[in-house]
């Protein structure tokens, strides 16, 4: 796992077309903004896991 440090307002670039910007930090919460092409899905981990579980349930 690559670990990077960013301050509010700073951005990470992934590949040629995805950027992640730190929008704010309040207590133990970090607000981030993600810019990605529409064909790339972006989900919180718990939502992604729910989607995967539903897909497995539908194929059974």
Swiss-Prot record:
InterPro entries: CsrA, CsrA_sf
One Pfam family from the record: CsrA
Protein localization: Cytoplasm
Top-rank lineage group of the source organism: Bacteria
One Gene Ontology molecular-function label: mRNA 5'-UTR binding
GO biological process: mRNA catabolic process; negative regulation of translational initiation; positive regulation of translational initiation; regulation of carbohydrate metabolic process
Record's keyword terms, sorted: Activator, Cytoplasm, Repressor, RNA-binding, Translation regulation
Transmembrane helix recorded as keyword: no
Gene Ontology CC annotation, any one: cytosol
SUPFAM superfamilies per UniProt: CsrA-like (SSF117130)
NCBIfam families in alphabetical order: csrA, PRK01712.1
Function: A key translational regulator that binds mRNA to regulate translation initiation and/or mRNA stability. Mediates global changes in gene expression, shifting from rapid growth to stress survival by linking envelope stress, the stringent response and the catabolite repression systems. Usually binds in the 5'-UTR; binding at or near the Shine-Dalgarno sequence prevents ribosome-binding, repressing translation, binding elsewhere in the 5'-UTR can activate translation and/or stabilize the mRNA. Its function is antagonized by small RNA(s).
Subunit text: Homodimer; the beta-strands of each monomer intercalate to form a hydrophobic core, while the alpha-helices form wings that extend away from the core.
Family: Belongs to the CsrA/RsmA family.
Protein name, as recorded: Translational regulator CsrA
Source organism of the structure: Buchnera aphidicola subsp. Baizongia pistaciae (strain Bp)
């Amino acid at each position: 796992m690559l670990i990077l440090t960013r301050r509010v307002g700073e951005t990470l670039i992934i590949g040629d077309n995805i950027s992640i910007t730190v929008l704010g930090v309040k207590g133990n919460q970090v607000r981030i903004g993600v810019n990605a092409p529409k064909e790339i899905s972006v989900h919180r981990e718990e939502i992604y896991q729910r989607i995967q579980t539903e897909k497995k349930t539908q194929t059974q």
